[in-house]
């Protein structure tokens, strides 16, 4: 393991020192860092050698479970990536962006033992974003229950969404991308390009906004999304937030509210990858504006709202992973939910796939290229 310590000096400069212990690894993070304006921090390399890590979950015994998109779940224990892997993992549609995606433990895991997974499930017509829950005995899953699959399945290898969060009131929210077909996001007759809400057992809450409406899917909470690859529920304010991976420009941070339309592809701050326009408008009545957006795109993936006293300078801020621009992005939002400041952290760290907060309140980052897990240490 390598440790990097960053000291903030007079608001202008910082010094970097490096030390190695017996777990030193030449693949550990050693790139340049943009120091935060509000919080001094260090970085520990927790594990290297991962292949396309996507999600992270923390068990009460200290183990960290990390999903690899190809369909495996790795175990980090006592600062080491174990050779042993979790058994009885479901088969996945491991094409392009599809595969084994998010993993979260139930807030009451100590009593009920549930672990929730999202993955691209193979099936007729291609693959579809699927949610399941299971229990862990030793290093094997047992008592596996598939809860939901987004319909229709699509012969596409992009835009699965797939983040899962709990609201602490008996519900789960999770994201589903529009699978590369823009029009899906505006159609209430499918689950694609949506944020969805279920009871924890997979049934549909009776107070979902489109329950009882003909031709509308009852699981839908909000719509008009492109590819929400970050999702967080802030229990302190009882608000749901997502980050959406935009096209060429137009990544978004959104406050996600019941029944609302987030505009894709009718309004966007992005353009097609070939430079042609998607639309000529960025606002329309009845469609929500992002709280923050990025032009050019940073390729957002992974989202956490810092709720821990471990990082007093960042408390209440959002940390967002950047795939294309390979950093962690910090966004400050006012009490009125307006973006007031942002900055780049951990520059050139690698393609950031996940940013999560552990039960102890520490922040962890998973990257691909190289595949590793890092811990942000407050100073």
Where are these regions (language model features)?
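Positively charged n-region of N-terminal signal peptides that target proteins for export
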Residues: 1-4, 378
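Sec-dependent N-terminal signal peptides
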Residues: 4-12
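C-terminal motif of bacterial Sec signal peptides marking the signal peptidase cleavage site
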Residues: 15-18
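Acidic, Gly/Ser/Thr-rich repeat motifs that build Ca2+-stabilized beta-propeller blades
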Residues: 23-181, 233, 239-246, 296-334, ...
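Surface-exposed loop and turn segments in beta-propeller and other repeat-based domains
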Residues: 85-98, 144-160, 200-222, 264-295
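Beta-propeller blade signature
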Residues: 129-139, 188-201, 256-257
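Short, conserved, GDST-rich strand-edge loop motifs in beta-rich repeat architectures
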Residues: 174-192, 250-252, 256
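Conserved blade-ending motifs and adjacent loop-strand segments that build the rim/top face
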Residues: 225, 337-359
């Amino acid at each position: 393991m390598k440790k990097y310590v960053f000291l903030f000096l007079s608001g202008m400069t910082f010094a970097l020192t490096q030390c190695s212990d017996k777990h030193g690894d030449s693949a550990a993070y050693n790139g340049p860092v943009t120091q935060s304006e509000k919080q001094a921090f260090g970085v520990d390399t927790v594990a290297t050698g991962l292949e396309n890590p996507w999600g992270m979950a923390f068990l009460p015994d200290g183990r960290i479970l990390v999903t690899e998109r190809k369909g495996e779940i790795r175990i980090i224990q006592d600062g080491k990536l174990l050779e042993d892997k979790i058994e009885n993992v479901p088969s996945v549609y491991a094409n392009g962006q599809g595969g084994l995606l998010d993993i979260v433990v139930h807030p009451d895991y100590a009593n009920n033992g549930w672990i929730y997974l999202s993955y691209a499930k193979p099936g007729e017509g291609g693959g579809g974003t699927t949610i399941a829950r299971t229990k862990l005995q030793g290093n094997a899953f047992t008592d596996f229950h598939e809860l939901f699959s987004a319909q229709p399945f699509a012969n596409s290898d992009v835009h699965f969404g797939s983040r899962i969060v709990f609201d602490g009131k008996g519900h789960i929210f999770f994201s589903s991308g529009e699978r590369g077909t823009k029009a899906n996001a505006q159609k209430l007759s499918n689950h694609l390009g949506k944020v969805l809400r279920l009871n924890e057992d997979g049934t549909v809450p009776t107070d979902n906004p489109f329950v009882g409406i003909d031709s509308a899917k009852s699981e839908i909470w909000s719509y008009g999304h492109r590819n929400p690859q970050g999702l967080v529920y802030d229990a302190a304010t009882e608000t749901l937030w997502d980050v959406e991976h935009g096209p060429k420009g137009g990544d978004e941070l959104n406050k996600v509210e019941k029944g609302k339309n987030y505009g894709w592809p009718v309004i966007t701050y992005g353009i097609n990858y070939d430079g042609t326009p998607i639309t000529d408008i960025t606002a329309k009545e009845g469609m929500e504006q992002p709280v923050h957006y990025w032009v050019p795109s940073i390729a957002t993936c992974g989202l956490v709202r810092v709720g821990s006293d471990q990082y007093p300078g960042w408390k209440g801020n959002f940390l967002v992973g950047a795939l294309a621009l390979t950093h962690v992005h910090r966004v400050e939002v006012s009490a009125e939910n307006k973006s007031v400041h942002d900055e780049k952290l951990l520059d050139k760290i690698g393609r950031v796939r996940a940013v999560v907060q552990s039960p102890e309140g520490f922040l962890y980052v998973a990257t691909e290229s190289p595949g590793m897990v890092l811990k942000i240490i407050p100073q």
